[in-house]
């Protein structure tokens, strides 16, 4: 299965081609929010690459959020247009899962099976989007207890208690994690810098058996904003 993958949820813009769960080409820019300019160029380059390799696109995978409102809208509109044009399904992948996959591949964590991976995407001010055991929430970060005592994260869907204890090794990362480093003081909480979601990891997760059957109805699909988008009111005279 050949999947065209898109990741625009943060300031990093990337697109990739994955073949049978293995990334074979990726285009990425880490230097700021230029998604509207870069993404069409990346898509054109990747489609040209697939033609040269004799491949045809079987699906488009998208990092669905949460994240930057503008970035998510750019990625979603591009992905939906490609799906309509190529007549292929859209496979959405949660961005926080993509971030965890990036941490497993890029960081020195060797015991991630027994540790807690705490992905954090910036949600402005002192808020982050994070997830424990699949429960994605926007959380105001004041200290470690903001996470461990959060009512939505204390009990996971299975009914078991929260896995974070005083002795649990916790690794936190993502573009929302740096501002937490100054308020987290436990010695077993470790900040990992420079971990970002990338399109190649979207493809790896999309190829899993679970995701392959979760394509969506294109006409009604919207990105996972989590927090309601509120447009800033203009203060220019004459504009409503």
Question: Where are the language model's segments positioned?
Answer:
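N-terminal beta-alpha supersecondary unit
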Residues: 1-66
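Surface "functional belts" at beta-alpha junctions
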Residues: 22, 31-34, 89-197, 225, ...
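A general structural signal for well-ordered alpha-helical segments in protein cores
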Residues: 36-40, 79, 199-203
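Stable alpha-helical structural segments in soluble proteins, enriched in small hydrophobic residues
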Residues: 46-50, 85, 103, 199-209
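Phosphate-handling active-site elements
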Residues: 48-55, 84-93, 108-112, 213
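DPxDG-like acidic metal-binding loop motif
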Residues: 59-95
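Acyltransferase
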Residues: 192-240
